[in-house]
UniProtKB/Swiss-Prot annotation:
Name of this chain's protein: Isoleucine--tRNA ligase
Keyword GTP-binding belongs to the record: no
Provenance organism: Zymomonas mobilis subsp. mobilis (strain ATCC 31821 / ZM4 / CP4)
Single Gene Ontology MF annotation: zinc ion binding
Binding site for L-isoleucyl-5'-AMP: 589
Quaternary structure annotation from Swiss-Prot or TrEMBL: Monomer.
PANTHER family in the record: ISOLEUCINE--TRNA LIGASE, MITOCHONDRIAL, SOLEUCYL-TRNA SYNTHETASE
Reactions catalysed, as given in the entry: tRNA(Ile) + L-isoleucine + ATP = L-isoleucyl-tRNA(Ile) + AMP + diphosphate
HAMAP family xrefs: Ile_tRNA_synth_type1
One Pfam short name: Anticodon_1
Family per record: Belongs to the class-I aminoacyl-tRNA synthetase family. IleS type 1 subfamily.
Gene name per UniProt: ileS
Motif ('HIGH' region): 69-79
InterPro entries linked to this entry: aa-tRNA-synth_I_CS, aa-tRNA-synth_Ia, Anticodon_Ile_BEm, Ile-tRNA-ligase, Ile-tRNA-ligase_type1, Ile-tRNA_ligase, M/V/L/I-tRNA-synth_anticd-bd, Rossmann-like_a/b/a_fold
Cofactor annotation remark: Binds 1 zinc ion per subunit.
Length: 941
């Protein structure tokens, strides 16, 4: 009777208080938007960045040199992608134990700021050119830049980017301006700079020359014309009195025509069209006749090679205007003339094209400088003088003044419209023209007189340096190589006010610029004291000293191309802070910087030092919306990073960045970020589980690794494999792979497998009779502790806020997780044989799980614990499964292994009773609610 009462009491008892359930105050709901600023404040208070510098002093240094964003406006999603990617790389390199300083910087000179400041003066009814002196204007530009530097600094810090924010580099700092001017002097002293009049890309809106890096291309519709030039003289009698036909997409250049070009090896024909004779390339005759609307016969009167046209002379269609227009137009042989389009004869205006300029120069034909800096022909020009902008569609239209005048004299044969790509200013978006103006250039193909690359050219030095740099992705090398091979000399002068001046004095008699180190030293000393404003307010005689008279020298009024500014950052940031000769390990920017910062930095460093300023270059793509479209406010598909941060937190943005294949263009939308948030929640919940599961864990509880059960050893094997793969991903900057590997390990190997199997041990292998738990439970928690230390570090470079939150939750007095180094993962944990064995076990477990699931849905079994499975396997698989408790691994009541040739897999509901504490269905449980042997043991029953 007493035994019966004891059994009844056992069954009736509530065993829940004896079961360990993971408990933690770590919130499931992240609340990142509120939590992250608190963590930022902690980092600021503890000066985490400086702690790292002190801790890593003497360690291997890794310099990721920051390409300067422009100090104008709030940050956009492209900025966020760039800065977060940089921070992930720097934090991961820091995790490897390296000293990774980060000096953020800003590009502060240039047109966008000038425009904004000009607007401010206009609102005050002031004319910038007449009412404001250069120094006053520059000071206002400086104030404007300071405002946006301060604004963007706070926005970048909110992304979690760690750096020397209190001491950034600015291209407008006095020391920076002095060093930029000093870099220019290196080029001038070695004879690499020259002044020349040649066609450069010119913005009539901004009234300045632009470099290739400042040019965007957009499709436009242009008026094209077929135009006849009368041939007045030739050694081929048939040609005299006939007409050479040219085709052009720029009618506005005709008023400056100086010659006609032919291809020496091209076949030409003179044809009779209704009594008039016209010269075309034979290969383009059919297309040309269609364009001018000729449908009848076209008898060939003469056929010959272009070389035979040498010495022929034509007259300008507007020759009756006299003067310039009455001068003869010679035929010139040009290798650039092809039969790809047009007529095979090209009109030459040396003011408005590189090929035109070079061919005419070779024949002593000079440009005429007919178009002013505002894009209008000079008022004294005999045709089109003082009329509208040459880029105006009205000027170039078929019914515009140029075409109308040419039609009136009978020279215009046809007009049409061509849809094609055309250069535009990347800032104003206005169409550009080629315009011949006096500019300052850095020569690419002139052998250097002295210095680091004496006897070599800048182009050959740069191309050699490209081969010595690591490019990520590899295609970046081909891209910049092609650009450097084909680019013209670098035009470094700008006709503006806000920038570093070209600190040269030109001899008024010889035209040579002064190369005197003493003069240069005085200039640089003044710049260090009062900035580049010194050039604009100086008594230049003080700079020249006693050796030279100001009346003999003209100070240059142009400023430097801003790309020379940013191209010099390796000098005034990297070398200035870390020692002369120091090179950055990495430059990282968008793919457009192959023609921008990567290239200007390469040319500047190669010209002054003979090598690239970087060891490796990594590029990322542009940000597009979820459908692959460019973001546009008018379309309404812009993602504002600040809004995302305020709603979801910076860690969501950081995880999105890491998840992308940023070597290509990347997509972002609300839907994309929603998917990122789902992935984040899974990782966060796994950390929450670890914190709860490790509650109360102590060193005394640890089990020697040699004594771990096989499953735990297998998990450590997977961890060792993961560790190696993550390390490789860091070194290859492959963070999308890094995040995928980390997420897959946590979600698939841990949450869905290891944690699932071992939750019974965690919950139920501890009690009053076993306060520290069984050996198996302690082994599990030992591995959980190893996993925690590894995973929180692995996550830290990407989820910098969440990793800190997790770490401090468990170790509130341990300092920042970002002060720790890469986890110590023993390579001996790798066990290929064990890995192969457990791959088989997991494969069979998956088969069992998939077979049970339909029965759970149909409520034939309530959970897998109620299932008995008959599993047919071959002998080799049976041996593997028999070596482990496969029922425990499948979380089932029982697994019966049978020969593979027998029946198919079956699942039945077990007849075993359910333990009242652990809920397992086991043979020793006498009836539902009674305890199994294990539970009796740990609770002391």
């Amino acid at each position: 009777m007493s035994d019966q009462k004891s059994a009844d009491a056992t069954q009736a008892r509530d065993w829940r208080p004896t079961v360990f359930l993971p408990k933690t105050s770590f919130p499931m709901k992240a609340g990142l938007a509120k939590k992250e600023p608190e963590i930022l404040a902690r980092w600021q208070k503890e000066d985490l960045y400086q702690q790292l510098r002190e801790q890593r002093k003497g360690a291997e240094r890794f310099i990721l040199h920051d390409g300067p964003p422009y100090a104008n406006g709030d940050i956009h999603i492209g900025h966020a992608l760039n800065k977060i990617l940089k921070d992930i790389i720097m934090r991961s390199q820091t995790l490897l134990g390296k000293d990774v300083p980060y000096i953020p910087g800003w590009d502060c000179h240039g047109l966008p700021i000038e425009w904004k400041v000009e607007e401010q003066f206009r609102k005050k009814k002031l004319n910038v050119d007449k009412d404001v002196n250069a120094v006053e204007f520059r000071q206002e530009c400086r104030k404007y830049a300071v405002h946006w530097v301060d604004t963007q600094r706070q926005e970048f810090k909110r992304l979690g980017v760690l750096g020397e924010w209190d001491n950034p580099y600015l291209t407008m700092n006095f020391e920076a301006e002095a060093i930029i001017a000093g870099e220019l002097m290196r080029f001038s002293e070695t004879g690499q700079i020259y002044r020349g009049a040649k066609p450069v890309l010119w913005s009539v809106v901004e009234k300045t020359a632009l470099a290739e890096a400042e040019v965007d291309y957009a499709d436009v519709d242009s008026t094209t014309i077929d135009l006849a030039f009368k041939i007045t003289d030739s050694k081929i009698p048939e040609l005299v009195g006939g007409y050479a036909v040219i085709w052009t997409t720029t009618p506005w250049t005709i008023p400056a025509n100086r010659a006609l070009a032919y291809g020496p090896d091209i076949d030409y024909v003179l044809v009779d069209l209704n009594g008039k004779h016209y010269l075309f390339a034979e290969a383009l005759l059919e297309d040309s006749l269609k364009r001018i609307g000729h449908e009848g016969d076209a008898p060939v009167l003469w056929r010959g090679k272009g070389a035979e046209l040498d010495g022929s002379i034509a007259q300008h269609p507007m020759f009756e205007k006299g003067g310039f227009f009455a001068e003869p137009r010679p035929f010139l042989g040009g290798s650039h003339v092809t039969t790809e389009a047009g007529t095979g004869i090209v009109h030459m205006a040396p003011d408005y094209g590189e090929d035109d300029f070079l061919l005419c120069k070779a024949h002593n034909i000079d440009p005429v400088f007919a178009v002013e800096d505002d894009g209008r022909y000079r008022k004294d020009w005999l045709w089109m003088g003082g009329e509208g902008l040459v880029i105006s569609p009205k000027i170039n239209a078929a019914d515009g003044p140029i075409c109308s005048d040419l039609r009136e004299v009978g020279a215009l044969l046809a007009t049409s419209v061509l849809h094609h790509s055309y250069p535009h200013s990347w800032r104003s978006k206005a169409k550009l023209i080629y315009r011949c103006t006096p500019q300052w250039f850095i020569a690419l193909d002139r052998p250097v007189e002295k210095g680091a690359i004496a006897g070599k050219t800048l182009r050959e030095t740069a191309l050699k340096a490209i081969d010595e740099v690591s490019w990520f992705p590899a295609k970046g090398k081909n891209r910049i190589q092609t650009m450097v091979e084909g680019r013209p000399d670098w035009v470094i002068s700008r006709q503006r006010a806000w920038g570093v001046p070209i600190t040269l004095y030109v001899n008024r008699e010889s035209g040579d610029y002064l190369r005197d180190p003493e003069v240069n030293a005085r200039i640089l000393a003044a710049f260090r004291k009062e900035g580049a404003d010194a050039w604009f307010k100086a008594n230049h005689q003080l700079f020249l000293g006693d050796k030279y008279r100001l009346e003999d020298y003209e100070p240059v009024n142009d400023i430097l191309d801003v790309w020379f500014d940013s191209g010099s950052t390796h000098a005034f940031v990297v070398e200035a802070r870390y020692g002369e000769g120091t090179r950055a390990q990495l430059y990282l920017e968008g793919s457009d910087q192959h023609r921008g910062w990567f290239q200007s930095s390469l040319l500047e460093s190669c010209g002054s030092r003979g090598h690239a300023p970087y060891e490796a270059v990594l590029t990322h793509g542009f940000t597009l919306d979820g459908t692959g479209r460019k973001m546009s406010k008018s379309v309404g598909n812009v993602i504002d990073p600040l809004k995302v941060i305020n709603e979801s937190g910076a860690d969501i943005l950081r995880m999105w960045v890491a998840s992308t294949d940023y070597n290509e263009d990347v997509r972002i939308s609300k839907e994309v970020l929603s998917g990122t948030s789902d992935g984040y929640r899974k990782l966060r919940n796994s950390f929450r589980y670890l914190l709860g599961a490790l509650e109360g864990f102590s060193e005394e509880e640890k089990v020697d690794l040699a004594d771990l059960p096989e499953l735990e050893k297998y998990i450590l094997h997977l961890l060792a494999e993961l560790d190696q793969a993550l390390h490789e991903s860091v070194n290859g900057f492959a963070f999308n792979r890094y995040l995928r590997l980390l997420s897959d390990f946590v979600n698939n190997d841990l949450s869905a497998f290891f944690f699932d199997i071992r939750k019974d041990r965690l919950y139920c292998d501890v009690g009053e009779a076993a306060p520290q738990g069984t050996e198996e439970r302690r082994a599990y928690r030992t591995v959980l502790d190893i996993l925690f230390h590894a995973l929180v570090r692995y996550a830290a470079p990407i989820l910098c806020f969440t990793a800190e939150e997790v770490w401090l939750h468990r170790f509130p007095d341990a300092g920042s997780v970002h002060l720790s180094v890469w986890p110590e993962v023993d390579g001996q944990w790798k066990n290929a044989v064990l890995g192969e064995k457990w791959a088989v076990i997991r494969e069979q477990r998956q088969i069992v799980t998939e077979k049970i699931e339909p029965l759970r849905r149909e409520k034939i079994v309530g959970s897998s614990l109620e299932a008995e499975v008959t599993l047919p396997v071959d002998a080799a698989t049976a041996k593997i499964l028999s070596s482990v408790d496969f029922s425990e691994i499948c979380i089932t009541a029982k697994i019966n292994l049978v020969d593979a040739s027998d029946a198919a897999i079956t699942v039945d509901r077990t007849q075993n009773h359910k333990c009242g504490r652990c809920w397992q269905h086991l043979p020793e449980v006498e009836e539902d609610g009674a305890l199994c042997d294990r539970c009796k043991s740990v609770v002391g029953e």
